[in-house]
Amino acid sequence: MIKETEQIPGPRPLPVVGNLFDMDLEHGLECLIRLADDFGPLFQITINGEKQIFATSQALVDELCDESRFHKAVMGGLEKLRMLASDGLFTAYHGERGWGIAHRILVPAFGPLRIRNMFEEMNDVAQQLCLKWARQGSSTSINITDDFTRLTLDTIALCTMNFRLNSFYNNETMHPFVKSMLYVLRESDIQSMLPGIANCIRVKARSRMSKHIQLMRNMARGIIQERRDQAEPVDDLLNTLLNGRDPVTGEGMSDDLIINNVITFLIAGHETTSGLLSFTFYYLLQNPHILERAQNEVDEVTGGERITVQHLGRLTYIDAILKESLRLMPTAPAFTVTPKKPEVLGGAWAIDAGQAVNVLLPVCLRDRSVFGPDADEFRPERMLEENFSKLPPNSWKPFGNGERSCIGRAFAWQEAQLVVAMVLQTFDLVPDDPSYKLRIKETLTIKPDGFRVRATLRRGQSATGLSQGSMSASGATSSVASPGPPAATGAQSNPAGGQRISFFYGSNSGTCKALAHRLASSLMGRGFTEQKLAALDTVVGNLPTDQPVIIVTTSYDGRPTDDAEEFVRWLESKRPVLQGVSYAVFGCGHHDWAKTFYRIPILIDDLMHKAGATRLTALGTANAAVSDLFSDLELWEETNLLPALREAFPPSNSSDVESSEPHQLQICVSKPRRVDMHRGLVEAKVTAVRTLTSPDSPEKRHVEFHVQGDTTWRPGDHVNILPVNPLSTVSRVLAYFQLAPDHSITVNSFNTQGLPSATPVSATELFSSFVELSQPATRKNLKALAMAAESKTDEQELIRLHDSYDALVRDKRVSVLDILERFPSISLPIGIFISMLPPLRLRTYSLSMAPSFKPSHGSLTFSVINEPAWSGNGQYLGVGSNYLASLTPGSLLYLSPRPAKDAFHLPADQFNTPIIMICAGSGLAPFMGFIQERMTWLKQGRPLAKGLLFFGCRGPHLDDLYYEELSEFEDAGVVEVHRAYSRAPDDVRAKGCRHVQHRLVTEAEAVRDHWGRNAIVYVCGSSNMARGVQTVLEEILGTLPPERYVAEIF
């Protein structure tokens, strides 16, 4: 039995005017929100003689979104807007025939791939915004809402209609369409609230509205006619409007329907998005910690390089910020539904068929029963995917509901993500008026009113640099003819074998060289022949045109590797003509070096394409911070490179086919040999070693060495070390393959992956010095191992490992050797095993001795990694650290100094520039060099500015590194040391502090004093420590300019 329904509450209406006096024509939304507070989750008012019901809770909205019971109603201001857009997608009545035709034609035009393909046009307009702000300078007060309106209007016109409004080239006034639109939206809202008689006497207002409507429709007609006059068709939304056919009726759209939807897209495609962007930046500037996290995410994901569509999916915090902004300020603040038949809403309130019910989003989306007691606060974490996915149904509806929801949501979202990311990447923003309180400007949509900002370019960028960057990004190019081989007219195959390929790399430490060798080896087994494998500098001016060119390279602090400098210089300055060259680029990077992430691979890829070369496939990338480089290379090879090669250079005969068997190296036993396969290394002699920690703490060691010749470095620099695999790991290999340590192995193969070729090497030397034994197995390795397993159970388990690769193999550091030992039924020839192993790479460490302190000497301070393996198989031994720990005085090691980024060096003016050094554990290494350099200066009689060191460790008798040396330096006035002990915070030296960030708070006054004297802050340590330090420093000091806050993360 249905219980008796209740009367819907609300303020008492007056005769004739209803609740008009309960509303404010300028701030109607604010009035409705107040009424929701007064009357609860469902209330009603009478406006213009009609009853209007408003729902304000998630539970009621969940019912109203049931399309089997309710459908969209076009009422109020939206109905008045039909004078402009009639049966356009947004203003059409439910079931209106024109809406059905347009909807069925247009929905496919907003599919994911089509939206992704609009990215470059979105990027074009976003760059115009950034260039305008950059040229105006940091002293200019920016009306951010107006500029976002220019941006979003230009973007929708360009992306969907290939029509440039060029709003940023008319800085003083808005485009006439915007002025007319704002008037029509506002007037529609006002007319919906006034009695009919009042509207009748507003003759001038109605006349102005008619003129504005005519202007907007004439503009739409002009856009349509210009397209019809074009000889060449353009595949965009406007083309779909003009030429699309309804798959149900076979009809196209009438001219009026086309005009209605052109106007609809120009309005709906920009008005709400500009409001979203404006509110988002308001909330970010009100919450600096959120702004910092967002900016850090952009830097980490993009690496400071040109934003691409692939980056957007990784901007998870930006995504949450936008969702949270729309939750608090839904820019289309209501949608209206009506029941198909009489309904009882919420089990209590009767709703007649045809009665409009408005979903009041600014209240619904702050429902405390869903979003908690802090629902009014801006907290993006609640919108991260793991939390967002757990919200009750229909809790977040800013884009409307069901079949009448916004079909351009993906367009708006991609645009908003791009713009937020680009602005955060390019500028530091501050409010123009720090005391500004949010005011809302209402039409049928909402935006901030009077919100202005100032924008300062980040990281020393310039407006000129942005201009040049945008030209490059948009594809502008000029070329100068240069002599070279004639362009190839088609794909050619090598009659002696498969299609020839040349591989070129840029590699300082050997990683990219190893990747190039691995890629060459893999393709050799797929019907291709290696023509050449060499450094990029060897091919300057002579790129082959009769075969594909594959490039594997990286960046070092934004610069090319040593063996690619001439090649990049040639591309940049000589502007060669590269027609006939077919190429693909694979780039490596690490997101901790955010400013220069993938810079050189992207640069090479872009310059070669602009010089006329044919890009075989999109740039492949691998981020060493979050993935396995070799697995990423294999994935790119399988999904991108190989299909492109097969299409561009098809096999010339049946023998040129991909082998299903892994390539097996040809092996014979011979005499031993040891070689140095890496360029640029110098020999050093170990002069001293010592353990810096007690037996009760994880081991940290000091290794000092002497280098002859003119090898130099600066305090703060790094050094690449050529290691040797731990003997225990090598012994496992020898035992598995039943080799004696002094067995000789000779590698005879057309591709040796950087191994010594046709030269006998002892088994111990081969597995110690030439290959990575602890590298995680790749997906391709797992496939081959599964094929080699004789046990069906083992085969199935290996397939399971392949299918759950990240969790079960990569993240647990499971090597090929681990798998062989775990699955004894695998029968794997040693040649295939060796072919699965990447070449042994160099390891990088910070130097911990200043060359001025002890000429021709250097030292390393490092943690020795010897811990239970995450795979569960014995101990995991860090290759580099265990090698260094095995050295004794007199041992030889091979190394190559490598400069740190410029900012991570002592200031040039040490007399006037204090320094603040913050670190934990072995992060002390570079600062020992800093302090020693300062000691040298002091001994030379040079005055020094103050220096503070904040150092964290476990305790005074555990791992308080270099305690005696630092005490001497402190006594000499070189540095002032502040310690934190995680296991002994009560020690007098720690002053109750467990971590360095706690000690920073304790010494906040000294930190502020040094900062006020233009100190530079240096941080070295783990990412967790660095984040904590930065948070505390922001609280103490405020904004940290990048030139004065420099972090090195390991």
UniProtKB/Swiss-Prot annotation:
Superkingdom per UniProt: Eukaryota
Binding site for FMN: 507-511, 585-617
Domain Flavodoxin-like: 501-641
Residue spans of biased composition, Polar residues class: 459-481
Binding site for heme: 406
Ranges where the FAD-binding FR-type domain occurs: 679-907
Cofactor dependency: FAD; FMN; heme
Pfam families in the record: FAD_binding_1, Flavodoxin_1, NAD_binding_1, p450
One GO MF term attached to the UniProt entry: FMN binding
Region (Disordered): 459-495
Biotechnology: applications noted: CYP505E3 can be used to synthesize the high-value flavor compound delta-dodecalactone via two routes. The first is the conversion of dodecanoic acid into 5-hydroxydodecanoic acid (24% regioselectivity), which at low pH lactonises to delta-dodecalactone. The second is the conversion of 1-dodecanol into 1,5-dodecanediol (55% regioselectivity), which can be converted into delta-dodecalactone by horse liver alcohol dehydrogenase.
Family membership noted in the UniProt record: In the N-terminal section; belongs to the cytochrome P450 family.
Function: Self-sufficient cytochrome P450 monooxygenase that catalyzes the regioselective in-chain hydroxylation of alkanes, fatty alcohols, and fatty acids at the omega-7 position. Performs hydroxylation of C10-C16 n-alkanes and C12 and C14 fatty alcohols; and thereby enables the one step biocatalytic synthesis of rare alcohols such as 5-dodecanol and 7-tetradecanol. Converts 1-dodecanol into 1,5-dodecanediol as major product with very little sub-terminally hydroxylated products with the 1,4-dodecanediol and 1,6-dodecanediol more abundant. Does not use hexadecanediol nor decanoic acid as substrates.
Name of the protein: Self-sufficient cytochrome P450 monooxygenase CYP505E3
Organism encoding this protein: Aspergillus terreus (strain NIH 2624 / FGSC A1156)
Gene: CYP505E3
